[in-house]
Amino acid sequence: PFAWENTSKYYDTQKQVAEDIVKGYRAFIKDIYAAGCRNLQLDDCSWGMVVDSSAPVLFGTTKAGLEKIKEQLLDVNNKAIEGAPKDLVINTHVCRGNFHSTYASSGAYDSVAETLFAKENVNAYYLEFDDERSGGFAPLAKVSGEKKVVLGLITTKSPVLEDKQVVISRIYEAAKYVPLDRLYLSPQCG
């Protein structure tokens, strides 16, 4: 939705764009599965942008309009992976950008938890939690079913290692919202 000015040169409606995105992802998933892939991580920058405080300006809408955009994003994602082989593990990494050790967006997951965590049909989420710009763990309470959560607690933006006890305590803090046996640890960029 935020690139519509340029996209409208090639498409008459946003629905047509969404349909082509779905087709493209389905073809890609079919091809990589045929090549032997059984674990697919989709890096999705859209959700990271939606939680940013500048999202209404970026998307050219109001906060209420962002609700419609979240539903559109969810619809495209779920349609894109619909019909994927049952033995293909599909995960979403909510990417906030990591170009030259900086980032493109900030914001807690609270505003997308009800849509993304509760309704996206994936096996796991890779989520950035390496600094305060990602907010707290409470939104993880919305993670539905048996989905796994990979906590990106280890930063790639600094050569300084995290304190082991701090990392352990943050994992236990996240376990208040998602059972410990469904939590995993990774660098913030998945």
Predicted regions and their residues:
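Domain-level signal for soluble alpha/beta catalytic cores
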Residues: 1-190
